């Protein structure tokens, strides 16, 4: 079903559709329109990576291990058996190689291999998330999760969000 961790897997995002592209394709991304994504994919436009955007992205990457640790702690506190299988692994759909996904966290949760997405959220965006413990997440993140499930062939994705770490 999937091809994992190929060293030949290109980092050239114009060559594939990744999880973060899906919301733009569906027209539900708060950051990018379908047309903007199209222009990036054909090389007619380059994503504007401002210093502020790079700083926010880097902070999220630094905090990701903390979010993982908090998630594992919460799952175990709730009586689940949870173990980390992999972090930031890249996958390509075997039949549709243009579909790729990088999974933040892979867990063995109560014996099932599941995907995990770690998010750090600005306090002003907290209203987009449901009550703690609910299944309410922003639609653009749900699309990313569904894409990852499709590419990996798994059936469950856990999203952990650290809200207000700014």
Language-model-detected regions and their locations in the chain:
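Nucleic-acid endo/exonuclease domains
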Residues: 52-56, 61, 65-69, 75, ...
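Intrinsically disordered, low-complexity boundary segments flanking structured domains
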Residues: 23-25, 66-70, 157-159
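Charged, glycine-rich intrinsically disordered N-terminal tails and low-complexity linkers that flank
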Residues: 1-62
């Amino acid at each position: 079903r999937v091809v994992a961790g190929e060293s030949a897997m290109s980092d050239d995002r114009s060559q594939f559709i990744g999880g973060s592209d899906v919301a733009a394709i569906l027209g539900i991304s708060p950051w990018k329109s379908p047309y903007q994504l199209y222009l990036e994919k054909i090389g007619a436009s380059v994503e504007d990576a401002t210093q502020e955007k790079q700083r926010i992205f880097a902070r999220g990457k630094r905090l990701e291990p903390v979010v993982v640790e908090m998630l594992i702690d919460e799952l175990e506190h709730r009586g689940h058996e949870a173990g980390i299988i992999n972090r930031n692994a890249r996958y390509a759909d075997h039949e549709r190689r243009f579909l790729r996904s990088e999974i933040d966290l892979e867990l063995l949760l109560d014996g099932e291999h599941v995907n995990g997405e770690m998010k750090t959220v600005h306090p002003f965006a907290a209203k987009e998330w449901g009550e703690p413990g609910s299944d309410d997440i922003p639609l653009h993140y749900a699309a990313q999760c569904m894409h990852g499930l499709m590419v990996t062939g798994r059936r469950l994705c856990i999203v952990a969000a650290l809200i207000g770490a700014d």
